[in-house]
Amino acid sequence: MKYIFVTGGVMSGLGKGITAASIGRLLKNRGYQVTAVKIDPYLNIDAGTMNPAQHGEVFVLHDGGEVDLDLGNYERFLDIELNSSHNITTGKVYRMVIDKERRGDYLGQTVQIIPHITDQIKDCIRSAAEEKVFDGKPADICIVEVGGTVGDIESMPFLEAVRQMRSELATADRALVHVTLMPSDSMGDLKTKPTQHSIKALRELGIFTDIIVGRSERPLNSHTKKKLSSLCDIPQNGIISAATAPDIYQVPMELEKEGMADVLCQLLQLRKDGADPEWYRIVTREYTHRITIGIVSKYGKEDVYLSIKEALRHAGRKLSTEVSIRWLDAERVEPADLRECDGVLIPGGFGVRGIEGKINAIRLCREERIPLLGLCLGFQLSVVEFARNVLGIADACSSECGDGTAVITILPEQEGVENLGGTMRLGDCPVEIKSGTIAYKLYRQHEIIERHRHRYEVDPAYISRLEDAGLIFSGRNGNRMEIAEIEDHPFFFATQFHPEFRSRPTSPSPPFLGFVEACLKNRGKGE
């Protein structure tokens, strides 16, 4: 097993995750099996209970792990399915160590950060790296991204563990990539001083960098690379320019041009086979159409809906269609806003805020035949809207958000659950598809697997009444409703699951493909 450690300096939010994912893609393009581990130095066990407006999207893995959005990027770039073990948090590590101490595993030792915490971190990294995620076989290379910034107190135990692993591994089995900011001064010149200080801080911890990735608004010139090489004692071919790209999926190609893959192959003594051009063909496909999709959201931060944005782009690229997203505040959205869109998407969420705005948006799309895709909460509210305005239950609601007639109720297994973290219906669940439906047309099979994250479901007592009134439940898990659709509508489709989490640039999600195609047809009618 070979390891590539990715650290960050100067400031957070530089794109370490995209850099790590892009490195993985470069090596995958050369025929290697690549996995990835994300270290998040916070005390939370996982991302499941975090405020999305602060933390961003909670990405759901196939085994139900609620993790940082960077793991979504890993899955999309590398075309793999990761497990909960691939996200290591301070909370997880401390809980493991404390559990061992309580069991007496340490045989009376004084439990300390070094060696007990650092040993546990190394065990977690190795265990995740050796997961057999490739048809029963482990990966050839593991990329380990250390969250946070060099110098943060929270990251210190993890950086010490990286230092130890670097010493324990053979030279050809490890490489360290440091992502750092290259700011411009008032004259537009790129400044190297912050990077020099960041490299110095790493060296003071006993960690020596092999490659520097300079994040900047414009490419690094040869003079800047030569200066960094001299001052940071790194060969000039190890100074990689990473200017801001218009499309994140083009970052691997930009790093390829900079020689990143060749340098890593040299460091890790890997064969330098030619790169598979499939990725290039997919991400450079030209657009011949353009559509606007409105997302009726309650959170102002776009990162909350990252996987939805990417799934729309995957479908759009497959159909040579550029997707422009219009963000519509669920508490302020007006009918005119919706009518200006070629289609409307109602995403998942929690709580009562913005609920009525979303329901009103669903009604307008149903009545005015605007393509609509509802996800999770969007599925539940589609049922509520139908119950109110077609079935005639004026006070229909979800028991999560109202005191009326609850056509959406809590899952039986969720009753009495006290802890919020890790207790929802999470991860992969099978869904049976009904023949002759939109769902079957999209998936072309009778049973599918999709990822879930919810506590509420359609009340079984109302299913037959809803179906008699024209709502088709085309996907089920036993007596649990999973997909709802309407006949004689351009595209009215809602899922209890989250299809966006399984979408890839190489294989777009079927519901998103169908939705974008319907939006494209809807736009064509108005032209």
Curated annotation (Swiss-Prot):
Keywords: ATP-binding, Glutamine amidotransferase, Ligase, Magnesium, Metal-binding, Nucleotide-binding, Pyrimidine biosynthesis. The keyword Ion transport does not apply. Mg(2+) binds at D70, E145. CTPSs have evolved a hybrid strategy for distinguishing between UTP and CTP. The overlapping regions of the product feedback inhibitory and substrate sites recognize a common feature in both compounds, the triphosphate moiety. To differentiate isosteric substrate and product pyrimidine rings, an additional pocket far from the expected kinase/ligase catalytic site, specifically recognizes the cytosine and ribose portions of the product inhibitor. It comes from Methanospirillum hungatei JF-1 (strain ATCC 27890 / DSM 864 / NBRC 100397 / JF-1). The active site is at C376 (nucleophile), H498, E500. Gene3D superfamilies: 3.40.50.880, P-loop containing nucleotide triphosphate hydrolases (3.40.50.300). This is CTP synthase. InterPro entries: Class_I_gatase-like, CTP_synthase, CTP_synthase_N, GATASE, GATase1_CTP_Synthase, P-loop_NTPase. Pathway: Pyrimidine metabolism; CTP biosynthesis via de novo pathway; CTP from UDP: step 2/2. GO terms for biological process: 'de novo' CTP biosynthetic process; pyrimidine nucleobase biosynthetic process. SUPFAM superfamilies: Class I glutamine amidotransferase-like, P-loop containing nucleoside triphosphate hydrolases. Belongs to the CTP synthase family. GO terms for molecular function: ATP binding; CTP synthase activity; glutaminase activity; identical protein binding; metal ion binding. Residues 292-525 form the Glutamine amidotransferase type-1 domain. UTP binds at S12, K191, T192, K193, P194, T195, Q196, K227. It catalyses: UTP + L-glutamine + ATP + H2O = CTP + L-glutamate + ADP + phosphate + 2 H(+); L-glutamine + H2O = L-glutamate + NH4(+); UTP + NH4(+) + ATP = CTP + ADP + phosphate + 2 H(+). Allosterically activated by GTP, when glutamine is the substrate; GTP has no effect on the reaction when ammonia is the substrate. The allosteric effector GTP functions by stabilizing the protein conformation that binds the tetrahedral intermediate(s) formed during glutamine hydrolysis. Inhibited by the product CTP, via allosteric rather than competitive inhibition. CTP binds at S12, D152, I153, E154, K191, T192, K193, P194, T195, Q196, K227. Catalyzes the ATP-dependent amination of UTP to CTP with either L-glutamine or ammonia as the source of nitrogen. Regulates intracellular CTP levels through interactions with the four ribonucleotide triphosphates. Residues 1-270 are annotated as: Amidoligase domain. ATP binds at G13, L14, G15, K16, G17, I18, D70. Its EC number is 6.3.4.2.
